[in-house]
């Protein structure tokens, strides 16, 4: 939402009563169809009276262009007759909101409003039209094809794109960024400046702290001079607080630290409930990078060494983040020129668990897991605010005036999600759906304005990395009589993402013919084909359905599962013509767009069949699960807290085999769980090959039918897309 827009307010309590009453009855009486009455009441009582009326498409379009609501450049890529036809086609699909929350979310957060906030200027169809006009880039026939995919909820662009497409006064189409900080004042200063600029533009920024020298390290060879990373964290937190989008919301930021950094325990202590105000970090999110060796040390009940990043750089000429601590651990341990301190590995993991119960932080990135899966020559050193983006980066170098001596390569996230249920229902059109989705995300990467962050601009222009994700897994499973914690659920997840990966790589391969290969393609495991060995050098029936029920589903929806021969042909084409994009898939939490699409979030199970949300002045909103009715209720009945961590990790691990980046994995624990239970969850996720752990949510025991109480964590509005 742009800084000039305000959310419309309700004039009277009567405005609220009827549709809120209908919505509440969906929970009270277990009559989920009543929620559709809430939708109708909301549209009639709230939306229509506050929607500006136009007598023709031309009158509306002229008004929106003349008054700087719509970007004339987007409109002018098409004739008026084409615009009118696309708009007419959009309304011909007769889109209807599946629940009250979907309608409320659209008009509250996405619909274009007059600058004074009094009137709506768009319905859902109009917002979709502006997206397809931009994403089709002047191609009328493509716009019609893409219109079908979006308005049928098969593909949903991420919030920054869906919200801002076609607007004259807008934010960026991409709102998630990753920045390295190196161990010098110029890099620190430039990072803070860039953070302010990106946050000013509604961006969420993750920053790497692993390479900063520890507290007590030398400065200009004088010992015990460095203050360590905590003061930098304070500066960053203040920067995000200051850059608060004109008071609309505080900037979103995260910092990642390698767990073998000497300041790691102080880093974690900043999130303690009883932390001293001098070190306490309230709003900045924390993430840890944990290599395999740390788990091995904990398993053996050994002490873990923390290595001076300053000494590592002096000795090896490499930053801490750019070496494999697992591979070099014992060499570093024996090197007398590397200062080291020791802590108990098990105590370290216990501290993480304690903090997860207190705050939900830190995020965890499994260092060696993501780098083993990495197809590129440079190391992955961090993730983003939702722990689904894992891409290599390169450091920048600066002059003393903070101008660039050498522009490195940093990261931005271009995201969008498939609705799994609707994608399966697309049947034989699945390949076209994924082709259009990849092309749309690719276009966003090519039109995004990133001048304020030259290293991010360079990384984006060289790589055009994408993050095609997915949502509504639980919704699809439940409506097809499959329990979330069943072998059929894992089987379906495996084969679905196997199929999506094939079509995503195929789409990028076709784009490469038109747009060229991404930079350094020749130096990747894609170019030599080894990345695809998991598909081409296994038994021909390895990637096939293992349960009759799942095979029957693919047959029912007429979704063709790629064969090994299909993969071999695709790999040959990739080796010949390349890929347009360095990365293709990443599964974000999909908070906002799941509500907008009235479906279940990401790959997670629902929290309960009817979720309770608090939405400002409206109070509680009851959100029935996807197509919830009395027939499928039993498949939604056990929510995330009842299921426990194992089924969720099993699902994520099945998908992760085919996702070249990461998957936002949230763990749900009851208040009966112990730190030992959480440690078991970390180990299980690590052993199953998950790339990361996002939040840990802990539910407190409450009275039946009262609101679900969890540790209140500020969801990332940027990355939950």
UniProtKB/Swiss-Prot annotation:
Entry keywords, A to Z: Allosteric enzyme, ATP-binding, Deoxyribonucleotide synthesis, Disulfide bond, Nucleotide-binding, Oxidoreductase
Disulfide bonds: 176-413
EC number of the protein: 1.17.4.1
Protein activity control: Under complex allosteric control mediated by deoxynucleoside triphosphates and ATP binding. The type of nucleotide bound at the specificity site determines substrate preference. It seems probable that ATP makes the enzyme reduce CDP and UDP, dGTP favors ADP reduction and dTTP favors GDP reduction.
GO cellular component: ribonucleoside-diphosphate reductase complex
Marked site positions, Interacts with thioredoxin/glutaredoxin: 716, 719
Site-annotated residues for Important for electron transfer: 694-695
UniProt: substrate binding residues: 159, 175-176, 204, 384-388, 589-593
Site (Allosteric effector binding): 183, 213
UniProt function note: Provides the precursors necessary for DNA synthesis. Catalyzes the biosynthesis of deoxyribonucleotides from the corresponding ribonucleotides.
NCBIfam families listed in its UniProt record: NrdE_NrdA, RNR_1b_NrdE
Family of this protein: Belongs to the ribonucleoside diphosphate reductase large chain family.
Protein name: Ribonucleoside-diphosphate reductase subunit alpha
Species whose genome carries this gene: Mycoplasma genitalium (strain ATCC 33530 / DSM 19775 / NCTC 10195 / G37)
